[in-house]
Amino acid sequence: MVFALDTTLSFPDPHLGEADGLLAVGGDLSVDRMLLAYSYGIFPWYSFRYNREILWYCPMQRFVIFPSEVHVSHSMRSLMSRGTYHVTFNQEFDEVIRHCSRLRIKEDGAWLGVDMVKAYRKMHEQGFAASVEVWQSDRLVGGLYGVTIGRCFFGESMFSSVPSASKLALIHLAHYMNDNGGLLIDCQFETPHLRSMGGRFIAYDDYLKIIQQE
């Protein structure tokens, strides 16, 4: 079942959503609503080419990476040891999301439009969204961004302008989280790229227990 949201700051029980995870339509992208959504594993998907409605998803099987389980291939270890790139955190959030937005606009069904970018920038300004940047000398060549609540990271998008830069960003994020008590990276959707790095499915109820830990 798909629910229509109004101005009330609430969401229906995620267990009542459609088989593909679609739970609700409408509402807004305010920081308060976004924080409430992510605290239950609900995330927005905005197919702005085809409609102006915000779609809210909450799949019952969650594709995640546990920081301690991230897989670093031999080729990635070699790349990291060469020192060609360096990685920073939260130095260029706006640039990372701009690159991700440009990439998504080229894709069919692009979702990262102006309203979404503004929403995540507001979350970053209030300390609820973060970025990882990959640099080659002084040139930004890759990165990712997502929402941070508690000890969990909800990945939203990544980009690479050179091979493996987004993988490098994700590896550094996982290592940082593992060293600092991070619990889980929510990947939202399965991809071969993420599965090769240690991603796996867990049931929503198990996922919810993790993301709501203090």
Regions flagged by a language model, labelled:
Residues 1-214:
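N-acyltransferase acceptor-side catalytic subdomain
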